[in-house]
């Protein structure tokens, strides 16, 4: 790659910005090597004991490539992200995609079937996720809504089902969780049991350590489910009690890649690509 510096523009600059973002640096992915990018490059150089000149030359590129080489990258999307250029995901370094499938007892994502078909046709690993609701939303009814999306979990390349457990759309709904904590924890447990039984897969739990503590009280009994933790920070994320480590880490809610217009959530897998393929049943 050519040396990049202030004033450079184009695809190579986007790749640089994406890689820095992957390492937890706050940077806009726009293909423009402006003051913001130069400042982040300088910080990266400082953090890695390189000459601090704000120029992405051979030594900086080598250090950056060495750090990102082993990271298995993914994104998570819904209809809110709009059209996705699926054919360029691989060139963006994306190995897997989480796709919103359903929410509560009645909503199914209008983009899900398009995402599902396109990704499986291209042999890109994917996982469907269900956004969990708590009030007037029985576990069986939520599971049935998720099943209506007709995901074939026996197909190679399909990761386990995911339940998204986080803040709700209003203060009143969030307060409901606090006021009915025991019942809400049971609701989650029931959904996981139903989905595991129906699919034959151990579901993945997506959550945030603060939400898990503040709203659910750090409940026990969930450590057997792989953890997808949301933590927008540079350092490794905090892990809720009951888990030894994370399986996936959503490290940015305002990421950027060429395949998606606008911002997109970015993720990294805590393991090798072979480990991820095993989780997705590839080669089994």
For each feature predicted by the language model, list its residue ranges.
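Hydrophobic anchor at the start of a short beta-strand
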Residues: 27, 126, 201-203, 227
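Acidic, Ser/Thr/Pro/Gly-enriched interdomain connector segments
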Residues: 1-31, 69-83
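Conserved hydrophobic/aromatic packing and binding residues within compact polymer-binding modules
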Residues: 41-44
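Functionally critical loop-and-helix segments that line ligand-binding/catalytic clefts
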Residues: 69-78, 88, 220-284
């Amino acid at each position: 790659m050519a040396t990049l510096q202030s004033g450079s523009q184009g695809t190579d600059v986007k790749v640089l910005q994406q890689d820095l973002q992957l390492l937890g640096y706050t940077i806009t992915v726009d293909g423009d090597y402006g003051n913001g990018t130069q400042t982040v490059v300088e910080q990266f150089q400082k953090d890695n004991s390189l000459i601090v000149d704000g120029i992405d030359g051979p030594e900086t590129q080598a250090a950056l490539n060495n750090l990102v080489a082993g990271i298995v990258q993914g994104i998570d999307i819904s209809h809110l992200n709009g059209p996705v250029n699926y054919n360029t995901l691989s060139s963006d370094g994306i190995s897997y995609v989480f796709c919103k499938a359903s929410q509560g007892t009645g909503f199914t994502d209008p983009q899900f079937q398009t995402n599902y078909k396109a990704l499986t046709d291209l042999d890109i690993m994917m996982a469907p996720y269900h956004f969990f609701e708590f009030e007037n939303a029985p576990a069986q009814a939520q599971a049935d809504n998720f099943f209506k999306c007709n995901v074939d979990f026996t197909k190679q390349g399909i990761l386990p089902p995911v339940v998204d457990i986080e803040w709700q759309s209003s203060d009143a709904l969030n307060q409901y969780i606090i006021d009915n904590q025991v019942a809400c924890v049971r609701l989650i447990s029931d959904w996981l049991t139903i989905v595991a039984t129906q699919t034959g897969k151990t579901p993945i739990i997506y959550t945030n350590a603060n939400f898990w503590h503040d709203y659910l009280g750090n409940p026990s009994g969930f450590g057997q489910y792989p953890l997808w933790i949301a933590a927008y920070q540079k350092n490794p994320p905090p892990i809720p009690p009951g888990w030894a480590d994370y399986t996936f880490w959503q490290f940015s809610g305002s990421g950027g890649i060429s395949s998606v217009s606008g911002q997109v959530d970015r993720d990294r897998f805590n393991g090798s690509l072979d480990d991820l393929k095993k989780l997705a049943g590839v080669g089994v």
